[in-house]
């Protein structure tokens, strides 16, 4: 599986995730504005953080 791993509005980058079946995208807000984190897997998140998990290559941009 290949997942995007750039932060927020950085230029898109990807990484290969051996053995993973999910990519994720987490979105939250703080004093800097909206923060977006992308990567492999499907982590558990605290309340108030939006999480999208998906199962195809580069699906988490």
Curated annotation (Swiss-Prot):
Tell me the superkingdom of the source: Eukaryota
Q: Does the keyword Secreted apply?
A: yes
Q: Where in the cell is it found?
A: Secreted
Do you know which PROSITE patterns this protein is assigned to?
A: SNAKE_TOXIN (PS00272)
Tissue expression, as annotated, is: Expressed by the venom gland.
An example GO CC term for this entry is:
extracellular region
Note the CDD domains from the entry: TFP_snake_toxin
Arranged from A to Z, the UniProt key words for this protein are: Acetylcholine receptor inhibiting toxin, Disulfide bond, Ion channel impairing toxin, Neurotoxin, Postsynaptic neurotoxin, Secreted, Toxin
Q: Which cysteine pairs are joined by S-S bonds?
A: 3-23, 17-40, 42-53, 54-59
One GO molecular-function annotation for this sequence? acetylcholine receptor inhibitor activity
Q: Which InterPro entries match?
A: Snake_3FTx, Snake_toxin-like_sf, Snake_toxin_con_site, Toxin_cobra-type
Gene3D superfamilies in the record: CD59 (2.10.60.10)
Could you tell me which SUPFAM superfamilies the record lists for this protein? Snake toxin-like
Do the record's keywords include Disulfide bond? yes
The UniProt family comment states:
Belongs to the three-finger toxin family. Short-chain subfamily. Type I alpha-neurotoxin sub-subfamily.
Name the job this protein performs.
Binds with high affinity to muscular nicotinic acetylcholine receptors (nAChRs) (tested on Torpedo marmorata AChR, Kd=0.07 nM) and with low affinity to neuronal alpha-7/CHRNA7 nAChRs (tested on chimeric receptor, Kd=3 uM) and inhibit acetylcholine from binding to the receptor, thereby impairing neuromuscular transmission. Produces peripheral paralysis by blocking neuromuscular transmission at the postsynaptic site.
Q: This protein is called what?
A: Short neurotoxin 1
Q: Which organism is it from?
A: Naja pallida (Red spitting cobra)
